[in-house]
């Protein structure tokens, strides 16, 4: 139910000749070639997929920021990527985590290809009367707690991770994600945390390869190009809708 208004915004106008319809794969019925899409859904939702000879991987973005960026480009067609990043500073990752550095994001926004690092959101606090611990409350995008725990135990057993006495998953519906990594006495929690970033998915990398179909042809798109394709599409949708309504009332 929460997604219903946004879903309707993607299809509003289908009954007003705003887009072309084409046969489905077995010619059983007609389906829209594209959706009218009242917001830049490719950027907002992100995308990931593999086809013959190509692949795409686009991070999700904040809806309000993406719309603000599109409006700015509409008002300022010569806007640079740096200008647009004032409105769209980076991806909005639903699982949370912390994006480390902007260089990879800027490269991806300029060229359509790039990578950036994400880290878990953590805090160091006392977990027992005598021991300190590392509390994980958010994980990098697409990383689950089971994978993290598995890697911690695997590296600790192999001697590649030192200073960890236990790890517990205390996640629940009320408090959300909570991993408690207990640090052995005599070890610096900050040093242990740096080991965890190096050896486990508490630090991960996300690669952007923004390939999308434009006019039926695959193209690698930077941020400005992606927003411009959306604006051109909306101009076409609005023009077709206006013609449909005028013809209807003639």
Question: Each predicted region: which residue ranges?
Answer:
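Long insertion/accessory domains within large nucleic-acid-processing enzymes
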Residues: 28-44, 49-52, 57
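C-terminal interaction appendages of subunits in large macromolecular complexes
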Residues: 5-9, 14-17, 48, 54-250
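Cofactor-binding active-site loop characterized by glycine-rich and histidine/acidic residues
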Residues: 2
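P-loop NTPase nucleotide-binding/switch module
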Residues: 9-38
């Amino acid at each position: 139910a929460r997604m219903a208004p946004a879903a309707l915004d993607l299809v509003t106008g289908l009954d007003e000749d705003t887009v072309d319809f084409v046969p489905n794969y077995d010619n059983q019925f007609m389906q829209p070639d594209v959706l009218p899409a009242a917001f830049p859904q490719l950027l907002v939702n992100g995308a990931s997929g593999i086809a013959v000879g190509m692949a795409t991987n686009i991070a999700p973005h904040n809806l309000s920021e993406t719309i603000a960026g599109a409006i700015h480009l509409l008002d300022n067609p010569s806007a640079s990527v740096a200008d647009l990043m004032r409105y769209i500073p980076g991806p909005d990752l639903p699982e949370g985590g912390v994006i480390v550095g902007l260089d990879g994001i800027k490269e991806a926004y300029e060229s359509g290809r790039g990578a950036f690092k994400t880290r878990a959101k953590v805090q160091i606090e006392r977990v027992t009367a005598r021991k300190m611990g590392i509390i994980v409350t958010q994980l990098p995008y697409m990383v689950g707690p089971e994978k993290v725990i598995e890697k911690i135990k695997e590296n600790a057993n192999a001697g590649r991770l030192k200073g960890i006495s236990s790890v517990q998953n205390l996640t629940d519906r009320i408090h959300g994600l909570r991993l408690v990594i207990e640090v052995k006495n005599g070890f610096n929690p900050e040093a242990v945390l740096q080991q965890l970033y190096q050896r486990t998915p508490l630090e991960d990398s996300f690669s952007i390869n923004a390939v999308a179909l434009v006019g039926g042809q695959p193209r690698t798109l930077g941020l400005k190009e992606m927003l411009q394709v959306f604006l051109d599409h909306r101009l076409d949708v609005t023009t077709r809708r206006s013609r449909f309504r005028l013809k209807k009332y003639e």
